[in-house]
Amino acid sequence: MNLKNYNERVVVTGMGVISCIGQTVNKFWNNLVEGNSGISKLTQVNTDGYSCKIGGEITNFDPNDYMDKKEAKRMARFSQFAVAASLEAISSADLDFNKIDLDQIGVFLGTGSGGLPETEKEDLLMFQKNKNTISPLYVPKMLPNMA
Protein backbone atom coordinates (compact mmCIF):
# COMPACT_ATOMS: atom_id res chain seq x y z
CA MET A 1 0.00 0.00 0.00
CA ASN A 2 1.35 3.39 -0.99
CA LEU A 3 0.44 5.77 1.83
CA LYS A 4 1.11 8.84 -0.33
CA ASN A 5 -1.95 8.04 -2.40
CA TYR A 6 -4.06 6.78 0.46
CA ASN A 7 -7.06 9.11 0.65
CA GLU A 8 -9.27 7.24 3.09
CA ARG A 9 -10.54 9.37 5.95
CA VAL A 10 -10.68 8.24 9.53
CA VAL A 11 -13.33 9.56 11.88
CA VAL A 12 -13.21 8.98 15.62
CA THR A 13 -16.81 8.45 16.65
CA GLY A 14 -16.41 6.99 20.12
CA MET A 15 -13.85 6.82 22.89
CA GLY A 16 -13.49 4.88 26.11
CA VAL A 17 -10.87 4.75 28.82
CA ILE A 18 -10.00 2.90 31.99
CA SER A 19 -7.06 4.50 33.77
CA CYS A 20 -5.76 5.45 37.18
CA ILE A 21 -7.22 8.95 36.75
CA GLY A 22 -10.63 8.00 35.48
CA GLN A 23 -12.80 5.13 34.37
CA THR A 24 -14.73 7.17 31.84
CA VAL A 25 -13.52 9.63 29.23
CA ASN A 26 -15.10 12.54 31.10
CA LYS A 27 -13.54 11.64 34.47
CA PHE A 28 -10.20 10.94 32.80
CA TRP A 29 -10.21 14.26 30.96
CA ASN A 30 -11.30 16.29 33.98
CA ASN A 31 -8.59 14.77 36.17
CA LEU A 32 -6.00 15.26 33.44
CA VAL A 33 -6.90 18.95 33.01
CA GLU A 34 -6.89 19.46 36.79
CA GLY A 35 -3.37 17.99 36.97
CA ASN A 36 -4.27 14.87 38.94
CA SER A 37 -1.64 12.24 38.23
CA GLY A 38 -3.33 9.21 39.78
CA ILE A 39 0.02 8.20 41.25
CA SER A 40 -0.13 6.98 44.84
CA LYS A 41 1.22 4.30 47.16
CA LEU A 42 0.75 0.90 45.55
CA THR A 43 -1.80 -1.28 47.30
CA GLN A 44 -2.54 -4.05 44.80
CA VAL A 45 0.96 -5.46 44.49
CA ASN A 46 3.58 -6.47 47.02
CA THR A 47 6.34 -3.87 46.88
CA ASP A 48 8.60 -5.56 49.45
CA GLY A 49 12.12 -5.64 48.09
CA TYR A 50 11.52 -2.80 45.65
CA SER A 51 12.66 0.77 46.17
CA CYS A 52 9.68 2.17 44.28
CA LYS A 53 6.44 1.92 46.21
CA ILE A 54 4.25 4.19 44.07
CA GLY A 55 2.41 3.82 40.79
CA GLY A 56 -0.83 4.40 38.97
CA GLU A 57 -3.35 1.78 40.05
CA ILE A 58 -6.87 1.35 38.79
CA THR A 59 -9.06 1.12 41.87
CA ASN A 60 -12.77 0.56 42.41
CA PHE A 61 -13.12 -1.30 39.12
CA ASP A 62 -15.84 -3.95 39.12
CA PRO A 63 -15.83 -6.08 35.96
CA ASN A 64 -19.40 -7.16 36.74
CA ASP A 65 -20.51 -3.64 35.82
CA TYR A 66 -19.51 -4.47 32.23
CA MET A 67 -19.91 -8.24 31.82
CA ASP A 68 -21.31 -11.28 33.56
CA LYS A 69 -19.31 -13.12 36.21
CA LYS A 70 -18.55 -16.08 33.96
CA GLU A 71 -17.05 -13.84 31.28
CA ALA A 72 -15.08 -11.86 33.85
CA LYS A 73 -13.62 -15.03 35.35
CA ARG A 74 -12.26 -16.10 31.96
CA MET A 75 -10.48 -12.79 31.39
CA ALA A 76 -7.40 -11.23 32.86
CA ARG A 77 -7.98 -7.85 34.49
CA PHE A 78 -6.38 -5.93 31.62
CA SER A 79 -8.80 -7.58 29.19
CA GLN A 80 -11.67 -6.59 31.45
CA PHE A 81 -10.41 -2.99 31.21
CA ALA A 82 -10.41 -3.27 27.41
CA VAL A 83 -13.99 -4.54 27.35
CA ALA A 84 -15.13 -1.76 29.68
CA ALA A 85 -13.41 0.95 27.62
CA SER A 86 -14.77 -0.58 24.40
CA LEU A 87 -18.31 -0.53 25.72
CA GLU A 88 -17.93 3.16 26.60
CA ALA A 89 -16.56 3.85 23.11
CA ILE A 90 -19.45 2.03 21.46
CA SER A 91 -21.94 3.91 23.61
CA SER A 92 -20.36 7.30 22.94
CA ALA A 93 -20.18 6.59 19.20
CA ASP A 94 -23.97 6.47 19.12
CA LEU A 95 -23.92 4.51 15.87
CA ASP A 96 -26.82 2.51 14.50
CA PHE A 97 -25.02 -0.74 13.69
CA ASN A 98 -28.00 -1.89 11.62
CA LYS A 99 -27.50 0.99 9.17
CA ILE A 100 -23.74 0.98 8.61
CA ASP A 101 -21.24 -1.31 6.93
CA LEU A 102 -19.57 -3.09 9.83
CA ASP A 103 -16.54 -3.82 7.63
CA GLN A 104 -15.83 -0.09 7.71
CA ILE A 105 -15.46 0.01 11.50
CA GLY A 106 -12.15 -0.42 13.29
CA VAL A 107 -10.85 -0.26 16.81
CA PHE A 108 -7.59 1.16 18.08
CA LEU A 109 -6.67 -0.17 21.48
CA GLY A 110 -3.45 0.18 23.42
CA THR A 111 -1.96 -1.98 26.15
CA GLY A 112 1.60 -2.37 27.34
CA SER A 113 1.83 -5.86 28.68
CA GLY A 114 -1.05 -7.83 30.00
CA GLY A 115 -1.61 -10.85 32.13
CA LEU A 116 1.39 -10.45 34.41
CA PRO A 117 -0.54 -11.50 37.55
CA GLU A 118 -1.60 -14.68 35.74
CA THR A 119 1.99 -15.39 34.71
CA GLU A 120 3.18 -14.89 38.28
CA LYS A 121 0.44 -17.17 39.65
CA GLU A 122 1.25 -20.00 37.22
CA ASP A 123 5.01 -19.61 37.78
CA LEU A 124 4.51 -19.93 41.54
CA LEU A 125 2.41 -23.06 41.09
CA MET A 126 4.91 -24.66 38.72
CA PHE A 127 8.21 -23.72 40.32
CA GLN A 128 7.44 -23.40 44.02
CA LYS A 129 4.68 -25.96 44.40
CA ASN A 130 6.01 -28.35 41.72
CA LYS A 131 2.69 -28.47 39.93
CA ASN A 132 3.10 -30.00 36.48
CA THR A 133 0.09 -28.39 34.82
CA ILE A 134 -1.11 -24.88 34.20
CA SER A 135 -4.58 -23.41 33.91
CA PRO A 136 -6.17 -23.89 30.48
CA LEU A 137 -6.97 -20.17 30.61
CA TYR A 138 -3.34 -19.17 31.21
CA VAL A 139 -2.42 -18.40 27.60
CA PRO A 140 -5.61 -16.47 26.74
CA LYS A 141 -5.29 -14.48 29.96
CA MET A 142 -1.68 -13.41 29.44
CA LEU A 143 -1.60 -12.45 25.77
CA PRO A 144 -1.70 -8.66 25.24
CA ASN A 145 -3.78 -9.03 22.07
CA MET A 146 -6.56 -10.67 24.10
CA ALA A 147 -7.51 -7.16 25.18
Regions found by a protein language model. Name each.
Residues M1-A147:
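Conserved "HGTGT" condensation-loop signature of ketosynthase/thiolase-family condensing enzymes
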